[in-house]
C-alpha cells in the first residue's frame, strides 16, 4: 500500500474513533491496514453490519445513501486537511494532541475515572505503563493484574462502574498485594500491550506473576469480553491457588536467605567495628607508649645536659672578690637549715648568686658527680642547645621579696651591701 493510502487509512480511523495518530498507525499495521477490522477491534462491533443487513431493503438504501454522503464528506475532509495553514484558521484540522509519557497517560486515565465515578476505585499503579508495572513485579517477585479497556467500546462504562469501582475486588487485590494497572487501547502503549497478550476483545484482564521455576514472568490467567467482579475474583482465586504456593515458598526462602545475609552483614559489621575499636585502642596505647618513651628520653637528655652544665659550673665557679672591691656579703640559708656566707661582686647580677646556690646544692644532691667535676683535670664544657633552669627560688629575708636573676646586686638594698638570702626549692 502506498504512503498516501496509508495516511488516508490513518485519517479515516482517527476521524471515526478520535484516537492518536501513533495509536491509529499501530492498530492499522496490526490489521494489515484494514480500517473496518481496526474499528471492530477497538469497539467490539464485529457483527453489527451483518445484523443491520437483515433489517430490509429500505435500510439498505438508507445505508447506501449514507455511505455516499460519508464518502463525499470524507474526501472533502481529506482535501481540507492538506491545505497549508488551514489548521491556523480552523482548529479542528490541527493536530494539537500532546504525546504523553506512560506515567502521564496512566494518571490521566485514573483522573478521568475519578471524575466520572469517584475515588473509591481499585488502587492502580500510575508510575508508568504496563511495562514498568511488569518490571516492578519481576524485581519484587510479585503478581500484577493488567486491565485493557477501550473507551470506544459500549461496555466500557459498565465495566468501569461495576469492576474498577468494586470494593470487594479492591479488598481482594489488596489482601494479596496484587499490583493493578489499567490502560485504554485507544492509546498506543496499551494497544501494544493488548497485542502482546493477544487480547482481541475488550475489556480484558491479564494476571501476570513471577515463576520461580522459569525465573521469568508468566501469564497465569486471561479474561476477555464482558467481565464482572465476581467472575474475576473466582478466576483469580483459581489461578492463584495453582501458581501462588510455589511463589510464596520462593518468597519465603528468599526472605530467609536475605534475613541470613542481613544477619551475617550485621555480624560482620559488628566484628569489623570491634576490630576497629581494638585497633584504635592499640594505636592509642602505642601512641601513649611512644609519647611516654619520648618524654622519658627528653627528660634523660635534659637531665644529662643539666648534670653537664652543673659540672661545668662547679669547675668554673669564680673566686670570691676581695674586701677592697666593696662586694656584697650575703648569708645564704638552705632548706636543710645549713648556712653559707659568701661575697659577690656588686656589679654582678643576682644570677651569680643563683649559680653559687646551684653549685652548693649540686654538692649536696650528687656528691659523686660533684667530686668528679671538681677533681678532674679534663676541662668540662657547657652543653649545646641547653638553657639551664634553676629548680629553686631565692628570696630576700627582710623585706621578703623574690630575687630575680637579671637584677644587679648593687641596686637591691635588701642584699647590698649585705643581707640574708633564703633558698626555697620548687615543688
Swiss-Prot record:
Residues 247-311 form a coiled coil. It comes from Schizosaccharomyces pombe (strain 972 / ATCC 24843) (Fission yeast). Its main location: endoplasmic reticulum. The keyword Endoplasmic reticulum applies. It comes from the Eukaryota. The gene is ucp10. It holds the Pfam family UBX. PROSITE patterns: UBX (PS50033). This is UBX domain-containing protein 10. InterPro entries: Thioredoxin-like_sf, UAS, Ubiquitin-like_domsf, UBX_dom, UBX_domain-protein. GO terms for biological process: ERAD pathway; positive regulation of cellular response to hypoxia; proteasome-mediated ubiquitin-dependent protein catabolic process; SREBP signaling pathway. It is found in: Endoplasmic reticulum.
Amino acid at each position: 500500500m502506498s504512503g498516501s493510502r496509508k495516511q488516508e487509512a490513518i485519517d479515516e480511523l482517527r476521524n471515526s474513533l478520535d484516537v492518536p495518530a501513533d495509536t491509529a498507525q499501530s492498530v492499522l499495521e496490526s490489521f494489515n491496514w484494514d480500517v473496518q477490522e481496526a474499528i471492530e477491534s477497538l469497539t467490539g462491533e464485529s457483527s453489527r453490519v451483518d445484523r443491520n443487513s437483515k433489517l430490509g431493503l429500505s435500510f439498505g438504501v438508507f445505508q447506501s445513501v449514507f455511505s455516499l454522503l460519508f464518502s463525499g464528506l470524507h474526501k472533502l475532509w481529506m482535501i481540507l486537511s492538506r491545505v497549508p495553514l488551514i489548521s491556523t484558521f480552523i482548529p479542528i484540522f490541527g493536530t494539537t494532541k500532546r504525546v504523553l509519557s506512560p506515567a502521564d497517560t496512566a494518571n490521566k486515565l485514573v483522573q478521568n475515572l475519578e471524575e466520572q465515578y469517584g475515588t473509591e476505585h481499585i488502587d492502580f499503579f500510575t508510575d508508568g505503563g504496563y511495562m514498568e508495572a511488569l518490571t516492578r513485579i519481576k524485581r519484587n517477585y510479585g503478581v500484577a493484574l493488567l486491565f485493557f479497556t477501550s473507551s470506544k467500546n459500549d461496555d466500557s462504562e459498565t465495566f468501569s462502574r461495576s469492576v474498577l469501582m468494586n470494593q470487594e475486588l479492591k479488598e481482594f487485590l489488596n489482601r494479596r498485594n496484587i499490583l493493578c494497572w489499567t490502560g485504554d487501547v485507544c492509546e498506543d502503549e496499551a494497544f501494544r500491550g493488548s497485542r502482546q497478550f493477544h487480547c482481541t476483545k475488550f475489556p480484558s484482564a491479564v494476571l501476570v506473576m513471577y515463576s520461580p521455576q522459569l525465573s521469568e514472568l508468566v501469564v497465569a490467567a486471561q479474561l476477555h469480553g464482558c467481565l464482572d467482579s465476581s467472575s474475576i475474583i473466582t478466576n483469580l482465586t483459581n489461578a492463584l491457588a495453582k501458581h501462588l504456593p510455589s511463589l510464596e515458598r520462593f518468597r519465603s526462602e528468599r526472605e530467609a536467605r536475605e534475613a541470613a545475609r542481613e544477619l551475617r552483614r550485621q555480624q560482620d559489621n559488628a566484628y569489623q567495628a570491634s576490630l576497629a575499636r581494638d585497633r584504635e585502642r592499640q594505636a592509642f596505647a602505642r601512641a601513649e607508649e611512644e609519647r611516654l618513651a619520648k618524654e622519658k628520653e627528653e627528660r634523660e637528655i635534659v637531665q644529662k645536659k643539666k648534670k653537664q652544665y652543673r659540672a661545668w659550673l662547679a669547675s668554673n665557679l669564680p673566686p670570691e672578690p676581695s674586701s677592697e672591691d666593696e662586694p656584697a656579703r650575703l648569708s645564704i640559708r638552705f632548706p636543710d637549715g645549713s648556712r653559707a656566707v659568701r661575697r659577690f661582686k656588686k656589679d654582678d647580677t643576682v644570677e651569680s648568686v643563683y649559680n653559687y646556690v646551684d653549685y652548693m646544692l649540686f654538692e649536696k644532691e650528687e656528691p659523686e658527680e660533684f667530686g668528679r667535676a671538681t677533681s678532674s683535670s679534663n676541662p668540662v664544657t657547657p652543653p649545646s642547645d641547653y638553657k639551664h633552669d634553676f629548680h629553686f627560688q631565692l628570696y630576700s629575708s627582710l623585706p621578703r621579696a623574690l630575687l630575680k636573676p637579671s637584677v644587679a646586686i648593687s641596686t637591691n638594698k635588701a642584699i647590698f651591701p649585705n643581707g640574708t638570702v633564703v633558698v626555697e626549692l620548687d615543688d
